[in-house]
């Protein structure tokens, strides 16, 4: 596969991952109610996200409430907000950088500089994936830990929501896409070639007697 094809494929994966990350950030399904007691007929399901919580009735009616106070939120929710939004914005910057250095655009003249710009964009995309992975894993760790904590009431136990799985998939796409962009750009950067200077000396003219020609002497 050519370097330009690698860049395009990587950019497509990064764009899909970026959309998935935005979707995961906005969905109120980071944790959902866990049904552990099958003898109890539940009339509603609770979803919780970074920006709102929703209650879904058994009839299908859903009512959501936006978090009004930032200070009242838990530390993991505040950190997840900051890191996820930061990853989304950084991915936007990475998009402009990658498009500037991509081989399919003419923003920069073709050459090593253009390839290094694309290489920077791919590295930024990979960094976005890692940045988004931190709050996702942190949040999931807290949900799992509270789920197995015997001191937490059954009614307050939650399971991993769909937004976490979408976020993990988006992070993987961002890192894989960024890696492909870097691979495609690395081919075009050009590797430095090292060579040793070769000195040539003019041949000496000699006479039949093996001495220098007398006309060389004054």
UniProtKB/Swiss-Prot annotation:
Assembly and oligomerization: Directly interacts with TJP1/ZO-1, TJP2/ZO-2 and TJP3/ZO-3. Interacts with MPDZ.
Protein name (Swiss-Prot/TrEMBL): Claudin-5
All ranges on the Cytoplasmic side of the membrane: 1-7, 103-123, 182-218
Membrane-related topology note: Multi-pass membrane protein
Residues annotated as transmembrane: 8-28, 82-102, 124-144, 161-181
All ranges on the Extracellular side of the membrane: 29-81, 145-160
CC per GO annotation: apicolateral plasma membrane; bicellular tight junction; cell-cell junction; cortical actin cytoskeleton; lateral plasma membrane; paranode region of axon; plasma membrane; Schmidt-Lanterman incisure
Biological role: Plays a major role in tight junction-specific obliteration of the intercellular space.
GO molecular function term, any single one: identical protein binding
GO terms classed as biological process: bicellular tight junction assembly; calcium-independent cell-cell adhesion via plasma membrane cell-adhesion molecules; cell adhesion; cell-cell junction assembly; establishment of blood-retinal barrier; establishment of endothelial barrier; maintenance of blood-brain barrier; myelination
């Amino acid at each position: 596969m050519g370097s330009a094809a690698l860049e395009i494929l990587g950019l497509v994966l990064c764009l899909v991952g970026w959309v998935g990350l935005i979707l995961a950030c906005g969905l109120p399904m980071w944790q959902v109610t866990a049904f552990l007691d099958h003898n109890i007929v539940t009339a509603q399901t609770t979803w919780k996200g970074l920006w709102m919580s929703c209650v879904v009735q058994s009839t299908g009616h859903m009512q959501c409430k936006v978090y009004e106070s930032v200070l009242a939120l838990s530390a993991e929710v505040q950190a997840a907000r900051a890191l996820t939004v930061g990853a989304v914005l950084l991915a936007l910057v990475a998009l402009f950088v990658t498009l500037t250095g991509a081989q399919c655009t003419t923003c920069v003249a073709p050459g090593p500089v253009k390839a290094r710009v694309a290489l920077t964009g791919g590295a930024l995309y990979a960094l976005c994936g890692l940045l988004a992975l931190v709050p996702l894993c942190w949040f999931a760790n807290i949900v799992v830990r509270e789920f197995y904590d015997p001191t937490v009431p059954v009614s307050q136990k939650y399971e991993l929501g769909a937004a976490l799985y979408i976020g993990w998939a988006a992070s993987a796409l961002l890192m894989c896409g960024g890696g492909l962009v870097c691979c495609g750009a690395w081919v075009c950067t050009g590797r430095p070639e090292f060579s040793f200077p070769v000195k040539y000396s003019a041949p000496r003219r000699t006479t039949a007697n093996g001495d220098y020609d007398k006309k060389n002497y004054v």
